[in-house]
């Protein structure tokens, strides 16, 4: 019993276990715990805890099942544009909720958001843009321009400041005079110093007035020059809330690396390197972005294991407050906009500040910005109008009479006499001028800058603004005065355009009532009224103004009269117009008849026989030839054709003329017998040569002309000259030339008429190699048997018709010839090489040839006897009876493709296998054929090059 | 010669299809078509004013329409550059013919409705084979140098009036194109029943009667006002009177021979241009289009009384 009394019990005891009963209530296993949303639906699905419920229980169906979408014709609603579906339309309610994919909440607008938030958002936007379906532009991916250019947008606060006249770099506050400013800077620097050395709770600064004295004597006259205050970091004096010693802050309760330590106004403690990163991490935690994986709903968030030990990790009391707090915080945070945190400081009763607004203040939403190209709002347009009017007329200063000027200058009401005696001058101008000069003299780098006014427009100068303001003030005053005046001096004129100037207005009213129209009379009339002080120019201007004003500010009746016309008048006018007899134009009928061919089908449909039995000439043959009529046909409708600008006789042929024309149609007999169809086909080509007769023809052209009318079989020569591999003849030719040059240089007579045999002697005697080997050798052998008809065979010297020389060579030859004529003494400079040395080249070729020969010999030696039968490998050896035809035809085309060669080799393969050759041999043969094909390719390239050259 | 009887209004139909661009009778005059600026064609019974069918499918204003000889098809021209061949009974477009490079202004059938002829703003006259399913024109005549305003045809000729002031006659039988130059832009062209003459409404507020054979100018009819409107004219079935619309809301009936105004039909007191008209192929009856309305005028008093 005693013991029981001494025991202290905490909590409620568990029910005593009954002996037989095993505890039935098992804790629910984690996997069996299900999170449900407010509708009782399961919130997370999938294999892992983190998943989303998409659609209807993760299906595409509904409670009734899935039905495929039925076809709905959009025909009826073609015009109505479909409402753009947003992703939100496909989301569930919970997706839009706090924990969904697209949480919706209150956010600060971009204009007000702080910088990193803005950046984050723009990043998001960019990410969106990067998605292919959203990238609308032609260039996929990030828009480059957006990357390069970033709109300059100040924060609203900055904008407001700017509109108040603040400029970046300046401080905020009332403008200071020079003296004041100096004091301020001194004070600031001192404070700064104190701040650095003693912290925020440093000693209060003593006022030192030493510096003032020297400045005082410098200048006292420039009181009216004001400067913007300097920008400095203001010092916030925080009230002391604790009872620690001076500048002692105790142990920081926050985690060391947390953000709050850096953001709190304790300067000397800790530099947080990870501030930004941490802040971002925090944000992430705050806004659950719907990541599928991570911390489960039932799991406690892991502790920050990398955080260093600090005091927060220790309990200071037995009660475990922490989780509670956390929950509370979380609940609170839900209603806080991203990037903000709730203020925990106790609410301080703040005295409401009554702001007395300027009288002409007009609230305006700064965010409703208009396009630059949108029409101006009426008010502003008017404002501008008046302002510019003022400027345009250049009369700003003339509008002021001496009284007003006196008012502006702050002079006391002077006697009229003195006012009149004063010379006319613009007080503003002079004053301002001197002011500007003084400012310029004082300050270096003072640049005239615009001031952003309330409307966001930059006023040219402050002066203009001041003048305007002053004027407005005067006008206001004047208006006030006139208000008291007995109204209806002149009842007829409701408008008082010159109300600002009473005298002027009076004059105007008189002028209006006089109803003068003559210019002279008006001047005289006005002269009587105008004060003597008014200059001639002013008088003139006033007259003009009056006339203009009288025009504008007319009584309503007149205005209406001008705008509207009575119906009777209109009718009368119309009748008059009608009555006016329209000028009689003699209509002369003209009839022209032309041939026109209706199409056969049209005739058929009209059940009419085709005119002339369908044998009519068709003028629109080319139109018919086109399969489809394209829009471009109409680009050259009859209006645009050349024929239309000429006499109509050209336009479809006249019947009368067409008959003789027909007789004429067969043109002068063609140079060669030709089928009739060809005549009609090529009328243009025939005409052309006659047109361009003056152009000297190249031999090739001549050949083309000659052979134009020949049958194809006879055109072989032409083709040869065009397409043949001009390698051989060129080499021949060059050699011939070289010889000639050599002979010339040796002083021998040039033997131009050398026989073929003689030339052959001069030729390179080395055996043909590579592709030429295959080209030449059979030719030489078969020369006797089949003389000419090869299409692209080499041309023998005597046969040569068209010799092509590369331009370079020709030029060189010419030059050399020219040089040869001139005596060597007359020429200076290094001598040009007359001809490439032949001798060194020859052995090379020879050597190559030798190598080839030797290779062949080797090949033949090493090859087994059987292989000797395989003559197909080297073309040179082809003389076989079976292949002769094919080979000759193949060889005849000098630029045979390598493919063909390959084919041939393939074709011949079976033969070889038939003969029982080993795979080794076939390999070798393949290699050979490859080599050959390579060579042939080379030759092909060469040929191509030649062709190009010849074309040029 | 029978005496001229005045025309009286028989029916007034509010077509409810925007401005009525053209009114046309069918082949025997029992029905009529109105082409609206709302891109639809409406088939009416002119006697009762009953709307029979609406044909919609054009993409722009319908400028002209014509019924086939058996009244089972309609061909219509539109500013959407296409011609549509409609089935009358189903109201469905059978074929859409596109080759014109500009809006099509006029269309007509030949006598047995095997060929449709159209003229457009692209200065081209196109002949379309209706029998086959060919979608390109059988023949294109591009001689005109300005917009084709009317095409007409008879057994062996195709007439095309153009704003270049010429009436072009394509004689299929002879294989000849005859160009009669008047010199004034022609806004409309009508044939007399005997096919001897053409009635050409000109831009200078004159209707001219042309002789087909010689190409001579037979007569001129003045009195109405054309201004710059596309005013149509017509000839009554007895070939004795010529009708024309006017820009001042009237219609004029001229005597063919002496060119006098027989009747100035006051269609409406509210003005509006009477720009389109159609004459009944058999009776003394006419259709007029003014603004949104279609008017049926007839000399037949009895019907009028019945109506009243």
Swiss-Prot record, chain A:
Residues 107-123, 375-402, 414-432, 679-691 have a biased composition (Basic and acidic residues). Belongs to the GPATCH1 family. PROSITE patterns: G_PATCH. Coiled coil: none annotated. This is G patch domain-containing protein 1 homolog. Residues 323-333, 906-934, 941-952 have a biased composition (Basic residues). Residues 214-233 have a biased composition (Acidic residues).
